[in-house]
Amino acid sequence: MRLSRRPETFLLAFVLLCTLLGLGCPLHCEICTAAGSRCHGQMKTCSSDKDTCVLLVGKATSKGKELVHTYKGCIRSQDCYSGVISTTMGPKDHMVTSSFCCQSDGCNSAFLSVPLTNLTENGLMCPACTASFRDKCMGPMTHCTGKENHCVSLSGHVQAGIFKPRFAMRGCATESMCFTKPGAEVPTGTNVLFLHHIECTHSP
């Protein structure tokens, strides 16, 4: 019997062989980042430690202005959360992201709707601040909104081109933010946060 030379048949056979033999074949994900609710990029091979594709759409609201960004890339499965995360880092600084995690080639080529921002105060409060080039920050109490019921404190560095400045943030967050652990790489839509420290507590 002759083997098919069709590329799609060969690819399927290759994937099946990897699965059956436990070879751990590398994952291929679409890679891109752009302003707006869509981005399109090339398929690239993920590094051996990144076994998941991620699609993330983030919306930041600051001083009445809204910015939407989309991110697609490779990520470690333990760093990826499928769902919505909402944070408030000040009275006029809100961020909400919607993410989709998957583990097959090109699975993050889909489309996600821009998440809705719920700015309705829920009666809870947390200390809030943001700071660059620091590991800690202090700030006044701010009102939590929507389903935000935890106070979060986090620090690390930002992957911003060749620069990796430190940052610190505190504020309100949904419980989904608390699944993130130190050492995680967290895409936000515009860049990637490398977390050194994160602490979540129930809002008083």
UniProtKB/Swiss-Prot annotation:
Subcellular locations according to the entry: Secreted
Disulfide bonds: 29-53, 32-39, 46-74, 80-101, 102-107, 126-151, 144-172
Any one of the GO CC terms: extracellular region
Domain of life: Eukaryota
Keyword Signal: yes
SUPFAM superfamilies xref list: Snake toxin-like
KW Lipid metabolism (keyword) present: no
GO molecular function, one term: phospholipase inhibitor activity
Residues of the signal peptide: 1-26
Keyword entries, A-Z: Disulfide bond, Secreted, Signal
Start and end residues of each UPAR/Ly6 domain: 27-117
Family per similarity comment: Belongs to the CNF-like-inhibitor family.
Protein known as: phospholipase A2 inhibitor and Ly6/PLAUR domain-containing protein
Organism: Homo sapiens (Human)
